[in-house]
């Protein structure tokens, strides 16, 4: 949301960014052997329950799971929700420096926008839930991450067209 707080990412898998089994790997006609998995089921449960509490307390104003297409697709789809909505993202928070891995890995995770950053961070920290603060929503229809600025209108049109064509085949 344009007037919301910061954008956060929680890697529910607690695994490294892996491309095996991803849509990205499929575009290269590969499946891959190294697929992400949930490394710590206790963390998963703790993080899930904490996020549910934050939703119940109206502290999360928008959210999306990481699924097909990875983090880049999630961020784009979150920006598709409104006109003149974009995001400025800083991926330097990740230890992983391979941009392909963190953009396209399909590790189970969530991205959400906070109502109040301090409340969100206090709750996550108190419950031992690790998170990454990625950036903020903007009123410019671009997904801006360092050297790349993606035009939301252009990618929304591609997404709708692709979804329409896929629906016709199903």
Question: Where is each model-derived feature located?
Answer:
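Mobile "lid/hinge" segments at catalytic clefts and subdomain interfaces of large enzymes
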Residues: 1-39, 52-55, 115-116
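Glycine-/charge-enriched secondary-structure boundary and capping motifs
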Residues: 33-36, 48, 52-170
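C-terminal transmembrane module of polytopic alpha-helical membrane proteins
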Residues: 39-46
């Amino acid at each position: 949301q344009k007037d919301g707080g910061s954008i956060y990412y929680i890697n529910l898998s607690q695994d490294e960014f892996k491309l095996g089994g991803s849509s990205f790997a499929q575009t290269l006609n590969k499946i891959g052997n190294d697929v992400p998995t949930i490394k710590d089921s206790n963390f998963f449960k703790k993080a899930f329950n904490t996020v549910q509490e934050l939703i119940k307390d109206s502290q999360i104003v928008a959210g999306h799971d990481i699924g097909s297409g990875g983090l880049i697709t999630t961020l784009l789809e979150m920006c598709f929700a409104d006109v003149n909505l974009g995001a400025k993202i800083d991926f330097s928070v990740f230890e992983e420096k391979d941009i392909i891995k963190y953009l396209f890995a399909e590790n189970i995770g969530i991205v959400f926008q906070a109502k109040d950053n301090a409340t969100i961070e206090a709750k996550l920290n108190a419950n031992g839930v690790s998170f990454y603060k990625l950036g903020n929503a903007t009123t410019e229809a671009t997904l801006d991450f360092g050297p790349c600025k993606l035009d939301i209108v252009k990618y929304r049109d591609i997404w709708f067209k692709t979804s329409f064509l896929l629906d016709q085949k199903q």
